[in-house]
């Protein structure tokens, strides 16, 4: 059973793991679902997959001896579902904001998501801005320099991916996990020093007993709503 991280001590103690929630946001057709399926199941479907509301996949990792359980939420990109965004990104430790490199408008919409996330969750959430479909480089409409400069200006990191060719995806999630671990460790040290502020644990690391988790988690895709 999950329990919120308490005082000092490493979260990666024997039999325990970091538990992080990551949400994918972006317009429809940018490839969010394809990225998640490629990462979690190494699957790719050329046909467009429309996500209705949200779904999630789970992934277990071992990074530098630290166990990590990821819950990756894939949200719908259609405008009519935008108002549901806060339901899915609240309490998130990380956000992956995806745009299609052949679609300038999808990049502009990412900027709106960044503003919303910073307003609602502050600077604690780790942001990744992802230019997907680099297999269509000849059709690129979003400048690499512009995208990378923007990401840096908002405290995010920029990545280049192709779900079709399976490029850049492992690097994206590995780097994000490392950043979330670093953030969680800073929070743990702050709590250990008695300097935590009200609400600090809102996106704090969750400590999970690994054995009970293994018994109760199916590890598959669970649709929401």
From Swiss-Prot:
A motif (Switch 2) lies at residues 76-94. GO terms for molecular function: GDP binding; GTP binding; GTPase activity. Mg(2+) binds at residues 33, 51, 74. Regulated by guanine nucleotide exchange factors (GEFs) including ANKRD27 and RABGEF1, which promote the exchange of bound GDP for free GTP. Regulated by GTPase activating proteins (GAPs) which increase the GTP hydrolysis activity. Inhibited by GDP dissociation inhibitors (GDIs). GO terms for cellular component: axon cytoplasm; cleavage furrow; cytoplasmic side of early endosome membrane; cytoplasmic side of plasma membrane; cytosol; early endosome; early endosome membrane; endomembrane system. Widely expressed. In jejunal tissue, predominantly expressed in the apical region of the epithelial cell layer of the villi, weak expression, if any, in the crypt epithelium. Capillary endothelium and some cell types in the lamina propria also show expression. A motif (Switch 1) lies at residues 43-56. Residues 188-225 are annotated as: Disordered. It is found in: Endoplasmic reticulum membrane; Golgi apparatus, trans-Golgi network; Golgi apparatus membrane; Early endosome membrane. Changing residue 33 to N: Defects in GTP-binding. Abolishes the interaction with VAMP8 in response to starvation. Abolishes the interaction with TMED10. GTP binds at residues 28, 31-34, 45-46, 48, 50-51, 77, 132-133, 135, 163-164. One of its GO terms (biological process) is intracellular protein transport. The keyword Phosphoprotein does not apply. Keywords: Acetylation, Cell projection, Cytoplasmic vesicle, Endoplasmic reticulum, Endosome, Golgi apparatus, GTP-binding, Hydrolase, Lipoprotein, Membrane, Methylation, Nucleotide-binding, Prenylation, Protein transport, Transport. The modification N-acetylalanine is found at residue 2. Its cofactor is Mg(2+). The small GTPases Rab are key regulators of intracellular membrane trafficking, from the formation of transport vesicles to their fusion with membranes. Rabs cycle between an inactive GDP-bound form and an active GTP-bound form that is able to recruit to membranes different sets of downstream effectors directly responsible for vesicle formation, movement, tethering and fusion. RAB21 is involved in membrane trafficking control. During the mitosis of adherent cells, controls the endosomal trafficking of integrins which is required for the successful completion of cytokinesis. Interacts with the cytoplasmic tail of integrins ITGA1, ITGA2, ITGA5, ITGA6, ITGA11 and ITGB1. Interacts with RABGEF1 (via VPS9 domain). Interacts with ANKRD27. Interacts with VAMP7. Interacts (in GTP-bound form) with VAMP8 in response to starvation; the interaction probably regulates VAMP8 endolysosomal trafficking. Interacts (active GTP-bound form) with TMED10; the interaction is indirect and regulates TMED10 abundance and localization at the Golgi. NCBIfam families: small_GTP (TIGR00231). Switch 1, switch 2 and the interswitch regions are characteristic of Rab GTPases and mediate the interactions with Rab downstream effectors. The switch regions undergo conformational changes upon nucleotide binding which drive interaction with specific sets of effector proteins, with most effectors only binding to GTP-bound Rab. This is Ras-related protein Rab-21. It comes from Homo sapiens.
